[in-house]
């Protein structure tokens, strides 16, 4: 059963006087029954999670609220791997805090379900009443501070709004941790479930998977040497909305089980080969290599200093020939 929660925390006023900040108010809402609870310490919050047997709890922006929770767990002797675990990636993106409360209590980030949306945005998205004006929270609050009814109501609003949205999603079968996982689940169901998915995207052998992954590249980011190290004014910035979905809808993409050997005309492919080359005049460099003693991983190569092994998709291979003078190629493997 899903629940939603929110923390209100002290700010600079308390930090300057006490040397620390803390949670001074929390709210908890049952998404199905709309029952509500609130309290003033993380300890009482944990107790309520146990009492209500909360197996899923959503905070909107887990990185903020979760940092107070993890700090409290460490300070109070909870042992990582025994009493709790968490999923936080190298970019400090928070996905889950898992508490062992005698049962598994999974704390997730509702901002991953509604990316880029504030709580107010979520209210507008679902056509429900939004948040009221925020009370003055920038005051000093001693340890025994008792929140006002106005402050309690404001804290509960956040949890109510997200609770409404989560219930709508769960009622429609969208019970994933993130919007991406919900979308992935729907795609699989639309093509025949797991078996249909595996028909289009078969599981590869480790060797074949490794070969394909070598061709994977990120976006092209490049600064013209003509402008490097200079302050440029009156710059125009352009963006393309929904470029990834556009490409997925209109351009050919690889599906199905790949096969070794030269491709037929018009087919997508990945090719590994050894080559040497230099950049054509008035063209852009497009090739980067990893784990090389001769080139920086962030450097686009203008000219090779030794034979270089590349693994490229057919799209990048075509681009490679368009922008580089290729001296030779050998040992092609498709």
Where are these regions (language model features)?
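Ser/Thr-glycine-rich phosphate-binding loops at phosphate-binding pockets of nucleotides
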Residues: 7-14
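Conserved acidic
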Residues: 2-4, 18-61, 66-334
């Amino acid at each position: 059963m899903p629940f939603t929660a929110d923390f209100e925390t002290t700010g600079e006023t308390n930090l300057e006087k006490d040397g620390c900040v803390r949670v001074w108010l929390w709210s908890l809402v049952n998404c199905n029954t709309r029952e509500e609870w609130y309290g003033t310490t993380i300890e009482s919050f944990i107790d309520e999670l146990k009492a209500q047997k909360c197996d899923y709890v959503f905070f909107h922006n887990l990185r903020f609220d979760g940092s107070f929770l993890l700090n409290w767990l460490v300070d109070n002797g909870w042992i990582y791997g025994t009493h709790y675990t968490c999923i936080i990636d190298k970019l400090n993106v928070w996905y889950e805090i898992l508490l062992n409360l005698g049962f598994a209590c999974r704390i997730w980030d509702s901002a991953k379900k509604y990316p880029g949306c504030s709580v107010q945005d979520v209210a507008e998205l679902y056509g429900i009443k939004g948040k009221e004006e925020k009370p003055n929270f920038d005051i000093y609050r001693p340890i025994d501070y008792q929140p006002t009814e106005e402050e309690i109501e404001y804290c509960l609003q956040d949890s109510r709004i997200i609770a409404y949205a989560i219930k709508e999603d769960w009622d429609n079968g969208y019970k994933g941790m993130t919007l991406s996982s919900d979308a992935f689940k729907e795609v699989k169901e639309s093509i025949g479930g797991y078996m249909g998915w595996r028909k289009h995207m078969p599981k590869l052998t480790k060797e074949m998977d490794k070969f394909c992954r070598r061709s994977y590249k990120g976006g092209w980011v490049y600064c013209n040497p003509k402008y490097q190290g200079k302050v440029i004014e009156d710059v125009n910035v352009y963006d393309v909305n929904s470029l990834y979905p556009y490409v997925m809808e209109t351009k050919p993409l690889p599906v199905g089980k790949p096969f070794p050997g030269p491709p037929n005309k018009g087919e997508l492919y990945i090719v590994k080969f050894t080559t040497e080359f230099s950049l054509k005049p008035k063209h852009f460099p497009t090739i980067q290599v990893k784990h090389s003693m001769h080139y920086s991983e962030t450097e686009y190569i203008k000219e090779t200093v030794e034979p270089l092994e590349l693994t490229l998709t057919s799209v990048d291979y075509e681009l490679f020939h368009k922008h580089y003078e290729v001296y030779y190629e050998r040992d092609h493997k498709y």
